[in-house]
């Protein structure tokens, strides 16, 4: 299951018991739309093992600024409340 990540709830999910994968995207971003089905499948396949979230950078620019996101899509990986990885661009 995918969750909606916002400025208000990212800390809660980051500090949860499961690792967190966050897809930062925007509605106007073509590459973001290309990877959306992959992110959804990841959420389905690893349900209960990781939390997969989507964060619209237009609505949550504070999240993008905090993690220095300059290009989208960007995927952030968190474990134990810490950022442990970052991937910028569409996955090929």
PLM feature spans:
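Proteins that catalyze or organize thiol-disulfide redox chemistry
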Residues: 1-51, 58-92
């Amino acid at each position: 299951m995918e969750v909606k990540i916002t400025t208000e709830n990212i800390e809660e999910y980051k500090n949860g018991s499961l690792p967190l994968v966050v897809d930062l995207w925007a509605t106007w971003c073509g590459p973001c739309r290309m990877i959306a089905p992959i992110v959804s499948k990841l959420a389905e396949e690893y349900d209960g093992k990781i939390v997969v979230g989507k964060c619209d950078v237009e609505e949550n620019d504070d999240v993008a600024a905090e993690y220095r996101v300059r290009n989208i899509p960007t995927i952030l990986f968190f474990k134990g409340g810490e950022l442990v990885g970052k991937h910028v661009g569409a996955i090929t």
